[in-house]
Amino acid sequence: MLSNLVVTKQKVVLVIDELNRERIAPKFIGSLLHEQGQGADTIKALPTGVSLKHVATFEALIDKYANNNTGSTTDSNSTGFNVILPTLADLLCYQTPAFIFGFLNRLRRSDNVRRVFLWASPQHLQDPHADYILAGCEYLAELVLRLESDKLLSLISRKPGGGVSNRRYSCEVSKTQFKVTPLDGGLPAGASPKQPSPEAEQTTEPASSTFKIELDEDEVLARNALTLPYERTSEPSEGNIIYTPDADDDFDEEDPDEDLCI
């Protein structure tokens, strides 16, 4: 399911919608959270409309979460809240890009916020610097989901250790779930890998392998019959030195010192 890939430990999630479906954004994100067991009491949304013009609306959101977290000891609140922000197009109608970036950064640093979701449709961004604003949101996001078409999406995930993964998936929407399958031939999201059978583990190297690791019968016999110089034999024997004279050796049987007067 798509929720297995989106609802993770990554805190700031940016959804880039190439299909212009902003109207389903809150319902779509809420369904992903519910699939992962996130209760309604952990999902909070920022008011939309003219109220976004007032900075107090944003401040009240952060203060509310802080007060709820300190005044309650339930398990749902102790893990933090899931914040669903208005679409980026709505935010830009009332606030500057600098304010939006600062607010996103505050939510990212807040201990009372578990995840932040922001939906952006590039075609709906009327700002002349829309490309730079969207790039700034991607920089702040730890997970970027791009809906490229009805059957294709991509996912960029940044991990705390600095690693980045970029994968593409084919998607299939049914009445009950949003199923995705990696385009590189991997298993669908949420599927457990199949355990290999013992017979498959015992298979030998294919004949087309360029590196031969097995010996045939004749090679095994030749290897066993070979005795290396440093090998120890099972039968004890005395040490003998055998010298075979060469043809150039000149031995004189007479004593060369016989003629000396000593």
From Swiss-Prot:
InterPro entries: Elp5 (IPR019519). Disruption phenotype: RNAi-mediated knockdown is pupal lethal. Its main location: cytoplasm. Pathway: tRNA modification; 5-methoxycarbonylmethyl-2-thiouridine-tRNA biosynthesis. Residues 246-262 have a biased composition (Acidic residues). Keywords: Cytoplasm, Cytoskeleton, Microtubule, Nucleus, tRNA processing. GO terms for biological process: establishment of mitotic spindle asymmetry; tRNA modification; tRNA wobble uridine modification. The keyword Protease does not apply. One of its GO terms (cellular component) is nucleus. It is found in: Cytoplasm; Nucleus; Cytoplasm, Cytoskeleton, Spindle. Signal peptide: none annotated. Residues 200-211 have a biased composition (Polar residues). Disulfide bonds: none annotated. Residues 181-214, 229-262 are annotated as: Disordered. Component of the elongator complex composed of Elp1, Elp2, Elp3, Elp4, Elp5 and Elp6. The elongator complex associates with and stabilizes microtubules; efficient interaction requires the full complex. Belongs to the ELP5 family. Component of the elongator complex, which is required for multiple tRNA modifications, including mcm5U (5-methoxycarbonylmethyl uridine), mcm5s2U (5-methoxycarbonylmethyl-2-thiouridine), and ncm5U (5-carbamoylmethyl uridine). The elongator complex catalyzes the formation of carboxymethyluridine in the wobble base at position 34 in tRNAs. Binding by the elongator complex stabilizes microtubules and promotes their growth. This is Elongator complex protein 5. It comes from Drosophila melanogaster (Fruit fly).
